[in-house]
């Protein structure tokens, strides 16, 4: 068996690959697209690595071109880096799913080893091969916490809450601990991490990376084979080689001091502010999570920045456990619906999954093209979407409090929003995007993960960002977001009745005059219908009043 050439002729990548046979290694490991690190392996002697590019998987949904470039270039760089260590590599390209070439490889290579796939989707694809013994599945060493830590502190069934798990992990690992007590006397410093950015500290420039011949070849391939996908094929701001990912890790030290206080801030002056942009590296294991945490806990920086970043890393473990223990939420007894389509509205033909997905509030509107780059007229939304279309990324507050918030207020079908995040963001995989969007960004899971929905009106966005100053809508006189906020609670008041966390909000909603309630609903309908037609919003005297 020899690896398959990625391009006909002697391309930059194919010309550097070597042929190999089953006898070149005593054991062979299949490493998927998100396990690209030899340090995951128990040993590196007498092993061989199998990597597979699946065009069918890449066309399963409308992935951003930069996400495709990122995955493919990292796989190819990793293959060459592995070869440089005298470890044989079988590199297969296929227009089938991963299981077909693996089944063929098993005929020559025998049973192949594999760490348990992080993504449920990949586990389902490979399940028959595992049952048949063609793949020998091992625990995934990339996770920092065993599942029993989760079940012993959180449980096997909802409601799932993070706090006890977070404390257990801190104590077990000794991260920012003095004996059994947290450094600083408390586990959470979240209250210190809510400052808006007013320009008082200049954020560093995001890392940029040299484009090499492997990157160039991948960019050309993506433009040729995936022309119908959204976004622009670029890699200058994404790490692809081992050296690039070391540079990405070094950037963490540059931003960590001010990460905490400005963790929730947004500004048109800087997309990243003091965020590390490391999620894309760690989610494919080019940088290991323990490497990141080691930098954080040893850093000489304010405690609120250390604890805030550590909390993000433990949240990553937490959502993985939630997703796995609920079988991707398929085992939960929650009202579910079948999405209209699985492309989040992007004009592309894909195999349509007809299964039901959580939709606690029965939200059924289609995602508007404003999420794919058409101008909405709201500066906060247009800024966030522009960042996604340009870089396949924003930090977590625009994701939660702009993109997800506005989708919730517009009653967008939750699975469509989830599909959009998964396709559009370079760091999105099912185990992380589904809990974050279905469980937190929307209220699709009910109170399974959150006690109340994360929604806000104009005041929060005005406080934590600077979009209102340049927006056509006045924040208190004509912005549609606050009327939509109140319309949301009026529409779904029955679903929230009895929720003590929302008691004050519901009382305030009930006290609004009939005239205001009518304006709220009219605003909601005008915004959703205008955006559904691909049009931009304009300020109107009779609508959007917050007074």
Model-derived features: positions:
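N-terminal beta-strand-loop-alpha-helix module at the start
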Residues: 2-90
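C-terminal catalytic domain of photolyase/cryptochrome flavoproteins
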Residues: 4, 20-22, 32-33, 265, ...
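Beta-rich, aromatic/charged-enriched effector core domains that present basic-aromatic interfaces
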Residues: 11, 23, 97-238, 438
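Short alpha-helical segments and helix-capping/turn motifs at coil-helix boundaries
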Residues: 13-17, 31-39, 99-105, 125, ...
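Short, solvent-exposed loop/turn segments at secondary-structure junctions
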Residues: 35-37, 56-57, 119-120, 142-143, ...
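Alpha-helical membrane-anchoring segments
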Residues: 49-56, 77-80, 118-128, 135-180, ...
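A eukaryotic "domain-start" boundary segment
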Residues: 57, 172-283, 477, 481-482, ...
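Short beta->alpha junction loops
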Residues: 90-98
